[in-house]
Amino acid sequence: SLQFRRWLSVIDYLQVNPALGGWAEFQQLNAQFETMADLVINHCSAESEWFKNFCAGKSPGAGYFLEVGEDFDTSAVVRPRSSPLLRTVETSNGTQNLWCTFSHDQVDLNFANPEVLCEAVRILKFLISKKIKYFRLDAIAFLWKRSGTPCVHLKETHELVKLLRLILE
């Protein structure tokens, strides 16, 4: 549903959805139960600061999203949506076609950029510091993209999951 998609369209990775309270309320809950969080690192919201900064050519955000050129072969891509794969946006660097696995309000991050990986690790470490013990890796199978492939369950994605597990251990 649209509401569920919005739930997974992260605007700020370090904040609790205000409709659910804040970190103080979370800590009260966490004192009574072991908690699990969705780690949504495949994509983030087109309303996020990262995306706004990407469009303006500023950091953090510049280079964070997957720009798809004409030479990228998407013919074998497998995804659970029938909406257009690419979203055209105007940026300070001109018109860009960005990868959107699920919807145009959820823009895929570019894990070929080491800064994006560092951000994902920083987010995970922050959530661990909040005593979250378990994580569901939302849409993780779609994390890495390689021209001419289905862009799902690629080796690079599995390597990244191994890295996340090492951090958790």
Model regions and ranges:
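Acidic/aromatic-lined carbohydrate-recognition and catalytic surfaces
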Residues: 1-121, 125, 129, 140-169
